[in-house]
Amino acid sequence: MATTERKPLLLDFEKPLAELATRIDQIRQLAEENGVDVSGQIRQLEARAMQLREEIFTSLSPSQRLQVARHPRRPSTLDYIQAISDEWMELHGDRCGGDDPALVGGIGRLSGQPVVMLGHQKGRDTKDNIARNFGMPYPGGYRKAMRLMEHANKFSMPILTFIDTPGAWSGVEAEHQGQGEAIAYNLREMFCLDVPIICTVIGEGGSGGALGIGVGDRLLMFEHSVYTVATPEACAAILWKDAGKAPQAAVALKIISHDLKRLGIIDQILPEPTGGAHSDPLKAATTLKQVLLENLDELNHLTAPERRQLRYEKFRKIGVFTEVAH
């Protein structure tokens, strides 16, 4: 995971923080030029900046959390794998002639335990994003994922999946290649695997593209990630014929972690560093590793039939509601 100092990419709601940071830098520069001690004032302003950052990030709207989830510097699947694994070897190919770079995976060790890790992979710049199709896999990506999961099942290795996609690619070519079948096959087969499966939404969890690697014993979610049946922009365009109503759609869709936990769709929320995972990737990775190990320890104490039954029951409960007569 890169640690080189780079100019921050600020989101719209972070502008007050940028203004305060500029003011601190100006005061510090003037003090150095004039030999004046303003350390007390600097400390007060820095404390105010920390407080303001905390206030902003604890009161984000769903559409603002979506901006954080889509941040260009948000840690990716490969970032997390490299940060949490003792060793790692990427495996390629779906054994049908393809190797989709939008979905990566391989074998590694997590605190000495052999595991298979796989997930969606977005690019870091325009060229990389085009090569990885902006993290939207073709059917071959899901077939590659299933091949790796079958490998994990054969050799009794837990499966860790990392979800970060706007959705599966919906182009004509993908449909010709059987996009719906590839995702449906994964859904069915993941329910039948004997090994522990832990799925983590690290950024965007979009539609069937997320579900294609999202059936597990545990569904974890980073605090500022989103998980949704459709992007708010698509939902607004469909329901109101106006993509500009995406913020209202984001509220209605219940895409944020706290709503999803309350609804029983996800199992655990992973706290992020103040400012989002991109503000301190190593801290976010440390949190992820700790939570994965805790959940693996619990799941390893269950038998394969117990895991399969609980996995099935978990998903059967999603969407259950009680009608109240008026």
Curated annotation (Swiss-Prot):
Gene Ontology MF, one = acetyl-CoA carboxylase activity
- Alphabetical list of Pfam families matching this protein: ACCA (PF03255)
PROSITE patterns for the chain = COA_CT_CTER
InterPro entries, per database record? Acetyl_CoA_COase_a_su (IPR001095), ClpP/crotonase-like_dom_sf (IPR029045), COA_CT_C (IPR011763)
Any coiled-coil ranges, and where? none
Its primary localisation, in coarse terms, equals cytoplasm
Metabolic or biological pathway, per its Swiss-Prot or TrEMBL entry:
Lipid metabolism; malonyl-CoA biosynthesis; malonyl-CoA from acetyl-CoA: step 1/1
Task: Give an example GO biological process.
Answer: malonyl-CoA biosynthetic process
Listed GO CC annotations: acetyl-CoA carboxylase complex
Q: What is its EC number?
A: 2.1.3.15
Limits of the CoA carboxyltransferase C-terminal domain: 45-298
The protein's job, in short, is: Component of the acetyl coenzyme A carboxylase (ACC) complex. First, biotin carboxylase catalyzes the carboxylation of biotin on its carrier protein (BCCP) and then the CO(2) group is transferred by the carboxyltransferase to acetyl-CoA to form malonyl-CoA.
Q: How does it assemble?
A: Acetyl-CoA carboxylase is a heterohexamer composed of biotin carboxyl carrier protein (AccB), biotin carboxylase (AccC) and two subunits each of ACCase subunit alpha (AccA) and ACCase subunit beta (AccD).
Question: HAMAP family, per this entry?
Answer: AcetylCoA_CT_alpha
Q: Which family does it belong to?
A: Belongs to the AccA family.
Q: What is this protein called?
A: Acetyl-coenzyme A carboxylase carboxyl transferase subunit alpha
What species was this sequence derived from?
A: Nostoc punctiforme (strain ATCC 29133 / PCC 73102)
The gene for this chain is accA
